[in-house]
Swiss-Prot record:
GO terms for biological process: translation. The keyword Chloroplast applies. GO terms for molecular function: structural constituent of ribosome. Keywords: Chloroplast, Plastid, Ribonucleoprotein, Ribosomal protein. The keyword Transmembrane helix does not apply. It is found in: Plastid, Chloroplast. It comes from Lactuca sativa (Garden lettuce). One of its GO terms (cellular component) is chloroplast. Transmembrane segments: none annotated. This is Large ribosomal subunit protein bL32c. The gene is rpl32. Belongs to the bacterial ribosomal protein bL32 family.
């Protein structure tokens, strides 16, 4: 079983955690942006079928 030899420093742990959080932040921002463009009809990457309500 692999066991780390030394304890990870607090600063290194904080750096890794911030990188992980930043990735999630950008993914959420892109998803929100895509949702906004789909709702306004400005999306260039998705084709949304329009339903006629009459």
């Amino acid at each position: 079983m692999a066991v780390p030899k030394k304890r990870t420093s607090i600063s290194k742990k904080r750096i890794r955690k911030n990188i992980w959080k930043r990735k999630g932040y950008w993914a959420a921002l892109k998803a929100l942006s895509l949702g906004k463009s789909l709702s306004t009809g400005n999306s260039k990457s998705f084709f949304v079928r329009q339903t006629n309500k009459s």
